[in-house]
Regions:
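N-terminal helix-cap/turn-to-beta initiation motif at the start of protein domains
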Residues: 1-14, 93
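N-terminal cationic leader/targeting segments used for protein routing and processing
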Residues: 4-7, 44, 48, 76, ...
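Short secondary-structure boundary/capping segments
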Residues: 5, 41, 68-69
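N-terminal glycine/threonine-rich, aromatic-flanked beta-hairpin/loop signature
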Residues: 14-50, 54-61
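Beta-sheet ligand-binding and adhesion/scaffold domains
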Residues: 15-19, 53-93
Length: 93
């Protein structure tokens, strides 16, 4: 598999349950249905992506970790949720 880069991941990505924007400066905006939002940062470690955020209206710091298993094309990646050990798809939008 080709190496995942920060430049490739920067942008807006859609998951079936949430969407996010990853900036080149490691800022993160994450959104869920019902207009729930979170703000934080993201980090690339090898092929592993670590999202750290605080949901609006809360003080709890949350983490979501996934690995990029395959770059299908420039707009689609297969990921593996580190906690659930489940393959999922992220699409650029």
């Amino acid at each position: 598999m080709e190496k995942v880069t920060k430049e490739f991941l920067a942008g807006r990505w859609k998951h079936e349950e949430w969407s996010c924007e990853l900036t080149m400066f490691n800022f993160l905006l994450i959104e869920w249905p019902m207009k729930i939002r979170g703000h934080g940062s993201w980090k690339l470690r090898g092929n592993e992506v670590i999202l750290t955020y605080v949901q609006e209206g809360t003080r709890d710091r949350m983490f979501y970790i996934f690995s990029v298993e395959e770059i299908v094309d420039e707009n689609t990646i297969k990921t593996k949720d580190a906690e659930a050990n489940k393959i999922e798809i992220l699409k650029r939008y």
